[in-house]
């Protein structure tokens, strides 16, 4: 059987909920008063939309093979990412065999080194890479996780990220993660409020339910150490997540060293590539790494990242990303559970992360999920969502 080549790659954008989960209306819990690197400025403290967290929007990448098979994926990137796909990366994709994913990844990454390496460019490469895996699996009429070695467990179990861990417990999740509301610039009063919120939630969920805190790069080492110590000793906080800016490897190493025994330090949501994660691992920055498969380099790179972590004895619990992480986590021994982002505006319902952009997107039931054998990542684009193609080549 001859292997098809790639006829065309296309990049689309769409606004609203979908690949860029930040792109929500102001009443959504994800746009509440949440600590961020911009919290030092009062004008940008109340809402993440005020400093532009939603400016990029969603990127949808389609790759069509010479036999008519189409793979697609969604990630964050919007029009700037669409331009990169159409004007730069397309030359490495079109005409290539659909099986040559490793070659295409290497060419995309090397060709963008002078203006890429992380951030938007690697988001874009990730989107293309995921679309290529979707295409290959559809051509083979298999789910992506079969191509990655097959499932090592019967089902996935999840913790929930959202504003209401107490509701997550009722829904059967193994734990709940909340966003931190106040950063160092809000002083002792802000610290007390953070601890009061956590203590209130601990009283609601009981002592045995996992509680975690997402700090979204907002803290410094001193504040993070103090918060983590009190939160662990008094409220049994399981982990402190992404406390520091992602480039502060030295700070993370100090935080992990200073954290109380038994409390976990986690990070990696905004890290990218095997080289970035190698820094985290070599410097012993954390107990769990949390790469986002739509931002770190795609499946192709996540395979390498996870191998490094496995050799270092560090767990891998990918950040969100729905089916794109589910198909990976189910195949890895050092990924014992997964994250589910509660994307309902008031997180009292389990809804698909990429709603309404994707159809057939599975969600956990009682905190658990079995993957089926639908080819590719098992999802379809919703034809009612208006995609636009701002650039062509």
UniProtKB/Swiss-Prot annotation:
The record marks 292 as: Increases basicity of active site His. GO terms for biological process: amino acid catabolic process; carbohydrate catabolic process. Gene3D superfamilies: Enolase-like C-terminal domain (3.20.20.120), Enolase-like, N-terminal domain (3.30.390.10). Its EC number is 4.2.1.90. It catalyses: L-rhamnonate = 2-dehydro-3-deoxy-L-rhamnonate + H2O. The active site is at residue 319. One of its GO terms (molecular function) is magnesium ion binding. Binds 1 Mg(2+) ion per subunit. Belongs to the mandelate racemase/muconate lactonizing enzyme family. RhamD subfamily. This is L-rhamnonate dehydratase.
């Amino acid at each position: 059987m001859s292997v098809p080549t790639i006829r065309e790659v296309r990049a689309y954008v769409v606004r609203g909920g979908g690949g860029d989960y930040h792109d929500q209306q102001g009443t959504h819990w994800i746009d509440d008063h949440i600590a961020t690197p911009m919290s030092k400025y009062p004008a940008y403290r109340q809402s993440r939309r005020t400093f532009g967290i939603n400016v990029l929007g969603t990127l949808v990448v389609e790759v069509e093979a010479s036999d008519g098979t189409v793979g697609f994926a969604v990630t964050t990137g919007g029009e700037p990412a669409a331009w990169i796909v159409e004007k730069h990366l397309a030359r490495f994709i079109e005409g290539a065999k659909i099986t040559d994913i490793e070659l295409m990844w290497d060419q995309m990454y090397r060709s963008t080194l002078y203006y890429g390496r992380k951030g938007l460019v690697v988001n874009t490469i990730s989107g293309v890479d995921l679309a290529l895996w979707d295409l290959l699996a559809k051509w083979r009429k298999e789910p992506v996780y079969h191509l990655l070695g097959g499932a090592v467990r019967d089902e996935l179990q999840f913790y929930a990220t959202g504003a209401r861990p107490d509701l997550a417990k009722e829904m059967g999740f193994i734990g709940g993660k909340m966003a931190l509301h106040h950063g160092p610039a809000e002083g002792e009063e802000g610290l007390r409020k953070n601890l009061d919120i956590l203590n209130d939630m601990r009283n609601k969920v009981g002592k045995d339910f996992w509680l975690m805190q997402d700090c979204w790069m907002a803290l410094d080492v001193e504040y993070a150490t103090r918060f983590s110590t009190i939160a662990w000793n008094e409220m049994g906080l399981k982990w402190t997540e992404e406390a520091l800016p992602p480039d502060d490897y030295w700070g993370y190493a100090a935080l992990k060293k200073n954290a109380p025994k038994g409390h976990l330090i986690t990070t990696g949501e905004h890290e990218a590539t095997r080289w970035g994660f190698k820094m985290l691992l070599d410097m012993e920055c954390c107990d769990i790494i949390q790469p986002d498969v739509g931002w770190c380099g795609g499946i192709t790179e996540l395979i390498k990242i996870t191998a490094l972590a496995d050799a270092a004895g560090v767990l891998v619990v990918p950040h969100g990303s729905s089916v794109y992480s589910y198909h990976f986590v189910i195949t890895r021994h050092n990924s014992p559970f997964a994250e589910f982002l509660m994307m309902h505006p008031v997180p009292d319902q389990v809804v698909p992360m990429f709603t309404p952009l994707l159809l057939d997107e599975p969600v956990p039931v009682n905190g658990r999920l079995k993957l089926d054998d639908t080819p590719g990542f098992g999802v379809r684009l919703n034809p009612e969502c208006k995609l636009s193609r701002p650039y062509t080549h």
